[in-house]
Amino acid sequence: MATMSLAAASPLASIPRGIAAQAPCAAFLSIRLGGATATRFAGLAVASQPAERRAAAMVAMAKREQELEEIRAMTTEQMEEEVVDLKGELFLLRLKRSARQEFKNSEFSRMRKRIARMLTVKREREIEQGINKRLSRKLDRKWKQSIVVRPPPSLRGNKEE
């Protein structure tokens, strides 16, 4: 009775190593270079992004740049006040969600991103002043402990009326 080893049964065992590495892959259909797509089959060419989508992305980027300019124009104290107000608004949104009241779901990400941008600019300023990470965290802890809890701007307007 003849025994057959697994190496002999393998389909790659009979193909020399250099030839097996050069075998074409059937899954390869196209290469994307910049905006153009070079395909193996002309009928499978994928259309580039629609012009409307690109235009919308450009508008969003311009708004983001404008918002960053506004944030950079603020003083550090104004930024800290704004962060406290935005965190209060975020808390109110969470309350509305838990109470199943009507709210805009997109406001969550918008506010969180604005808070993150402000804190990033604040940290950039600290780096310019030469404050290291450890001291920055220490100052941040002190700042958080010194925050006076107050209602966010949206509730302040309701109380005055």
UniProtKB/Swiss-Prot annotation:
Presequence extent in this chain: 1-61
Gene3D superfamilies (alphabetical): 1.10.287.310
A molecular function GO annotation: structural constituent of ribosome
Full protein name: Large ribosomal subunit protein uL29c
SUPFAM superfamilies: Ribosomal protein L29 (L29p) (SSF46561)
Any one GO biological process: translation
Pfam families, per the entry: Ribosomal_L29 (PF00831)
Entry annotated with the keyword Transit peptide: yes
Any single GO CC term annotated in Swiss-Prot or TrEMBL for this entry: chloroplast
Recorded name of the encoding gene: RPL29
Keyword Transit peptide: yes
Family according to the record: Belongs to the universal ribosomal protein uL29 family.
UniProt subunit comment: Part of the 50S ribosomal subunit.
Organism (species): Zea mays (Maize)
Subcellular location: Plastid, Chloroplast
Domain of life, per lineage: Eukaryota
Keywords, alphabetical: Chloroplast, Plastid, Ribonucleoprotein, Ribosomal protein, Transit peptide
InterPro entries to which the protein is assigned, alphabetical: Ribosomal_protein_uL29, Ribosomal_uL29, Ribosomal_uL29_sf
Description of what induces expression: By light.
